[in-house]
A protein has these predicted regions:
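C-terminal capping/gating helix-and-loop segments adjacent to ligand/active sites or protein-protein/ligand interfaces
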Residues: 378-432
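Extracytoplasmic/periplasmic substrate-recognition and gating elements
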Residues: 259-260, 297-360
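Conserved N-terminal structural module of periplasmic/extracytoplasmic solute-binding proteins
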Residues: 2-116, 135, 180, 330-334, ...
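Short, solvent-exposed loop/beta-turn-alpha elements that line the ligand-binding surface or hinge
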Residues: 129-140, 183-190, 230-250, 297-302, ...
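Glycine-centered hinge/linker elements that transmit conformational signals in sensory
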Residues: 197-201, 237-267
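Periplasmic solute-binding protein
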Residues: 120-122, 144-184, 216-236, 318-325, ...
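Hinge/lid segment of periplasmic solute-binding proteins
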Residues: 112-165, 194, 304-308, 376
Length: 442
């Protein structure tokens, strides 16, 4: 993932923290939101050169992996300028304004997964249909589906994804008398997050002093929801959050955690959560691929060799983005070629090697190589294989236009009411319901 975390927390805080997770906050001329102050499609770069502008948020890793320089060496007539905005919640409204105006867009615009449904439903005619210019089979089917309009236009090419695993402290498991082998653990909770909760109950019987099984109930909710077939909307864009089987199952698993003693009751990406890694106060966390670097950074040297990675109960996704070409681009042909090249399997593998952004192109998986230090940090776990297995079995989920704020209402209002304030699950659900009705204007 670039460094914008998209799903279940306050966006501003998330994006900034995610950038720290990879340690790759870009240095650039900044406006008031901490991003680049320039925008707009590229013009001539002098002496017949074409300047292509690429609008991104956070850190996509293209510059850091040397991809822009490589492309410009291969195409002497092309100059590339990246316009970066740190925060997604600042970036996307600006993009929408420019799309609606029909001018001022970059030649390539990044689209975060939390915004892709809005782009597909309300801005589809403002983007070029890229499906005519690429072999769509290069990307995961569910990834393409997220960026495809009802009339079949593919408005974005997949960049990274966030396949899920369980990262765990094997030293704490050993002290609690539990198996430490990643394969055995994966078998214990395979197919059901409630089985994961059952392992948590076993852990707490002999938990090392000062430790809990899991960081938060919201962590379990998001991971479980990401593996379900339904979220908050059906495929016809009808709101079904209060009837969704996926929401119900995820909520029940989260409540089993929130009403027990197994949660550290930490809010993800708050400073106390970071401190929890450093102090070793929780034994497991549901971890998408991009969180590997974050855990390594926050746990520090003392965590080396203590962390391990096992397959999650169900395949799930948290994160990912796309590259689209606005119809307002002055250089559509050249922009399409650059977008195709940046998202090709070979280039996605290079970005993974630089900052662990997991590719959305399966043909890249066989050659992926995480950093040697990272592999050792996580007890030589087959990280690439674990995440690849998850990536290829993730269910296709439909994201509605208010998907993100509904999710935040459930995690930051409903679940926290139970976990941190001692409310009953029914009271937490009622609190989330009130917040969601406000979001939906009901």
């Amino acid at each position: 993932m670039r460094t914008s975390i998209h799903r279940s927390r306050r966006l501003g805080a998330l994006v900034a923290v995610a950038a720290m997770a990879t340690g790759l906050l870009a240095g650039c001329a900044k406006d008031s939101d901490g991003g680049s102050s320039q925008a707009g499609g590229g013009d001539g770069g002098g002496k017949g050169k074409i300047t292509l502008t690429v609008g991104t948020f956070g850190v996509f890793g293209y510059k850091q992996a040397g991809l822009y320089d490589e492309y410009m060496k291969l195409h002497k007539n092309i100059s590339i300028k990246e316009n970066v905005t740190t925060r997604t919640d600042v970036y996307w409204p600006k993009v929408l304004t420019r799309l609606q105006a029909g001018s001022g867009t970059d030649d390539i615009q990044a689209i975060e997964v939390g915004n892709i449904t809005e782009a597909v439903q309300t801005q589809g005619d403002k983007f070029v249909d890229l499906g005519k210019d690429v072999d769509k089979s290069q990307w995961l089917g569910w990834k393409n589906a997220q960026a495809t309009t009802k009339d079949g236009k593919l408005i974005g090419l997949g960049t990274d994804i966030g396949p899920m695993a369980i990262c765990y402290r094997k030293d704490l498991f050993q002290k609690a008398g539990l198996p430490t082998d990643r394969t055995k653990l994966a078998e214990q909770w395979k197919g059901d997050w409630n089985k994961y909760v059952d392992v948590g109950k076993q852990y707490m019987k002999k938990a090392p002093a000062g430790t809990k099984f899991v960081d938060s109930a919201a962590s379990v909710y998001n991971a479980a929801l990401g593996g379900g077939k339904e979220r908050y909307y059906d495929k016809d864009d009808n709101v079904i959050w209060d009837k969704s089987s996926g929401v119900k199952d995820a909520w029940n698993a989260a409540m089993a955690v929130a009403t027990s003693d197994m949660s550290a009751k930490l809010k993800q990406f708050d400073p106390t959560w970071d401190q929890g890694y450093a102090k070793g106060t929780f034994a497991t966390v549901a971890c998408p691929a991009w969180m590997i670097g974050y855990i390594e950074q926050k746990s520090g040297d003392s965590g080396k060799g203590k962390w391990d990675v096992a397959a999650a109960p169900t395949a799930a996704n948290w994160g990912g983005s796309f590259l689209g070409v606005p119809t307002a681009s002055k250089h559509q042909k050249e922009a399409i070629e650059l977008a195709k090249w940046l998202t090709a399997p070979e280039q996605q593998a290079k970005v993974f090697a630089k900052q662990a952004s997991f590719p959305s192109t399966p043909s890249a998986y066989a050659g992926l190589k995480p950093a040697t230090d990272t592999t050792a940090y996580f007890s030589n776990a087959p990280i690439t294989q674990i995440f690849a297995d998850s990536a290829t079995t993730i269910p296709v989920q439909y994201f509605g236009t208010k998907d993100q704020p509904i999710n935040t209402a459930i995690t930051d209002v409903g679940i926290l009411q139970v976990e941190q304030k001692g409310k009953t699950p029914a009271q937490g659900w009622d609190a989330a319901t009130k917040e969601i009705k406000d979001v939906l204007g009901q």
